[in-house]
């Protein structure tokens, strides 16, 4: 009797053990991708799909030139398979220190897991020489290239190439998703260019606060005639402001465009004195909760600019 009970107990134990055995999961763990900006993160998600888990260090409402380096950033970088930066010196004040502190050789410059998203972009405004008198000028050219939506394609290709380097087994997927993104982006760019003409933006003159909008202006046939900042990062003097107001009163300026992370008080005064509409524009994905994709960013830009142009035409 005791022998029977022992056998029964063993059978129950073995059965319970076997019932918990499951086949090994075949789904790969998503690659950890860390980007410096939300725009790069959005495009990385387009290319990587569910094979990536993407984190941006800079929030969409922050100035990407100046980001407080948090210890948590180093933890994220320590575990990253891929690091993607805007490059062209945009993050020079904060990203190199984080990369070195993270102690992850896989994502250092020159390693397979490092991506300079500008590597396939035709960069503009590269200075022939650099001096302190020029302010915070970027010696490697204007880094705000993502604000020409056509540049989303070379950005995506640079990210695709980086993903393939660190995960060659997913090359076919990354290639397909990149091609799909480029196709959809091409259709959207055509739509936005037509929209720029329809709302009367193309061919107009504008003043901007910072040199963030050079690529956007080139993409949509705008002429930037002056800046609130006389030089990048240098606050305007009273004389510069007065000269700017005089220039803007000539009546041929369509808009005063300003990035959403600068103090709006001076641009508001200039707009009041000149009658030129001030538009405060997002420069990045996730500038607010409704701008979730790269496509959303440009849809928002045109949705903000269109009524400002109408108000300017009435005044």
Regions found by a protein language model. Name each.
Residues 20-315:
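Extracytoplasmic metal-acquisition and chelation regions
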Residues 7-19:
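Bacterial N-terminal signal peptides
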Residues 1-4:
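Positively charged n-region of N-terminal signal peptides that target proteins for export
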């Amino acid at each position: 009797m005791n022998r029977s009970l022992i056998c029964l107990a063993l059978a129950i134990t073995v059965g319970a053990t076997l019932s918990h055995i499951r086949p090994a999961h075949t789904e790969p763990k998503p690659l950890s991708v860390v980007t410096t900006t939300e725009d790069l993160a959005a495009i990385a998600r387009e290319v990587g799909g569910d094979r990536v888990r993407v984190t941006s260090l800079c929030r969409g409402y922050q100035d990407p030139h100046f980001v407080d380096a948090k210890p948590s950033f180093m933890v994220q970088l320590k575990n990253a398979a891929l690091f993607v930066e805007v490059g062209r010196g945009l993050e020079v004040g904060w990203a190199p220190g984080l990369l070195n502190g993270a102690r992850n050789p896989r994502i250092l410059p020159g390693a397979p897991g490092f991506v300079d998203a500008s590597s396939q972009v035709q960069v503009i405004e590269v200075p022939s020489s650099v001096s302190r008198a020029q302010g915070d000028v970027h010696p490697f050219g204007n880094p705000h290239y993502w604000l020409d939506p056509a540049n989303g394609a070379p950005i995506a290709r640079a990210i695709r190439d980086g993903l393939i380097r660190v995960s060659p087994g997913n090359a076919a997927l990354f290639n397909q998703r990149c091609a799909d993104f480029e196709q959809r982006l091409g259709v959207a760019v055509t739509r936005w260019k037509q929209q720029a003409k329809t709302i009367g933006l193309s061919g107009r003159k504008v003043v901007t606060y910072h040199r963030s909008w050079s690529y956007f202006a080139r993409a949509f046939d705008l002429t930037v005639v002056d800046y609130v900042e006389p030089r990048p990062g240098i606050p305007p003097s009273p004389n510069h402001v007065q000269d700017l107001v005089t220039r803007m009163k000539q009546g041929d300026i369509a808009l005063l465009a300003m990035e959403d992370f600068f103090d709006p008080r001076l641009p508001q005064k200039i707009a009041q004195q000149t009658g030129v509409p001030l538009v405060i524009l997002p420069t990045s994905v996730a500038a607010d909760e409704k701008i979730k994709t790269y496509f959303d960013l440009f849809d928002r830009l045109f949705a903000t600019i269109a009524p400002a142009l109408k108000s300017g035409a009435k005044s």
